[in-house]
């Protein structure tokens, strides 16, 4: 009994020393502010995922002070103003800091999650690190947020022709989406991530676009009601990216962070697939093969236009082109080679 008591005392002593050592180590590390956009707040998946990231970052040489924002524009403004050393944003917001990785969200450029996984793996490779840095900024991780689908208040809006003249909620800073709206002849209604769902749900717009993870928290089912639906067509691959002021972090922090993000890709994908699966089947609207082919070509033309206008980075478009053609080498775009 005495021996057990001695062992317990020794164990507790060792445990307290470990915690003390950990505490001292954390105190010695530089504290860096990390601003995270999560529309749901502290209970949202982006912020919750960053709690594990924060623990991992201690080994990379930084103690992170996490701040969550439910308004992405405010998070972006604070980062630009220097109030944040790093920030987590949606891919569309990344363009001022890295046009190369912002082009991941190019419309129709990634066919499925396997291509997305391969891309994130390629970009997490140390050989790709030079593309992750532009000026003072470094992309420190890319995580999937899911395929972007079109939500409609009436299933009769199941074609480009049917969408002509309809009011489409359009993220006002998303140049690609604005061009798509013009292509289909819809009426653009400017919105933000904070306002697109309320406008869709109250009938102010006829269509909106979002990944499946938006369905439940944004209550998109209210806007669809009994007549609405979701077109099963991958408009783009939404993603989240972490941006650092690289001079505020240790030299290898960004690389280790990118590797961490890729390692956790399956976990993020599981959350996305679950969200898609949990949407009632009655809402999904399948397009004919002819429509699918027609709309993919329309998006390809939009990509080429945006590349020529300097919005999309041709280097990223070339990588995405190669991923698509490896998966489907007989496709006519692989012969035409307009993005290769």
Q: Can you describe what each PLM-predicted range is?
A:
Residues 10-20:
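Bacterial N-terminal signal peptides
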Residues 28-60, 138-202, 206:
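Bilobed "Venus flytrap"/periplasmic-binding protein-like clamshell domains
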Residues 22-26:
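Sec/Tat signal peptide C-region and signal peptidase I cleavage site
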């Amino acid at each position: 009994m005495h021996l057990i008591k001695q062992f317990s005392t020794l164990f507790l002593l060792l445990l307290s020393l470990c915690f003390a050592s950990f505490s001292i180590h954390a105190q010695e590390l530089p504290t860096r502010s990390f601003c995270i956009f999560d529309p749901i707040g502290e209970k949202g998946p982006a912020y919750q995922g960053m709690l594990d990231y924060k623990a991992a970052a201690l080994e990379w040489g930084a103690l992170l002070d996490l701040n969550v924002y439910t308004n992405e524009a405010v998070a972006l403004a604070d980062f630009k103003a220097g109030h944040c050393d790093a920030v987590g944003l949606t891919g569309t917001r990344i363009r001022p800091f890295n046009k190369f990785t912002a082009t991941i969200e190019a419309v129709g450029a990634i066919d499925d999650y396997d291509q997305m996984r391969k891309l994130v793996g390629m970009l997490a490779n140390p050989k790709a690190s030079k593309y992750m840095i532009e000026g003072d900024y470094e992309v420190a991780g890319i995580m999937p947020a899911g395929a972007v689908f079109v939500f409609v208040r009436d299933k009769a809006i199941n074609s480009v022709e049917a969408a002509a003249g309809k009011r489409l909620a359009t993220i006002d800073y998303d140049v690609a989406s604005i061009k798509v709206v013009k292509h289909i002849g819809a009426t653009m209604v400017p919105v933000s991530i904070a306002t697109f769902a309320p406008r869709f749900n109250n009938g102010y717009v006829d269509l909106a676009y979002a990944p499946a993870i938006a369905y439940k928290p944004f209550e998109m089912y209210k806007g669809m009601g009994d007549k609405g639906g979701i077109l099963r067509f991958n408009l783009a691959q939404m993603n989240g990216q972490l941006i650092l002021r690289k001079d505020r972090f240790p030299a290898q922090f960004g690389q280790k962070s990118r590797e961490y993000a890729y390692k956790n890709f399956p976990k993020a994908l599981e959350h996305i697939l679950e969200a898609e699966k949990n949407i009632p089947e009655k809402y999904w609207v399948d397009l004919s093969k002819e429509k699918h082919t027609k709309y993919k070509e329309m998006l390809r033309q939009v990509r080429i236009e945006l590349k020529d206008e300097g919005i999309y980075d041709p280097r990223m478009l070339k990588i995405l082109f190669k991923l698509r053609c490896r998966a489907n080498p007989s496709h006519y775009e692989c012969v035409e080679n307009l993005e290769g």
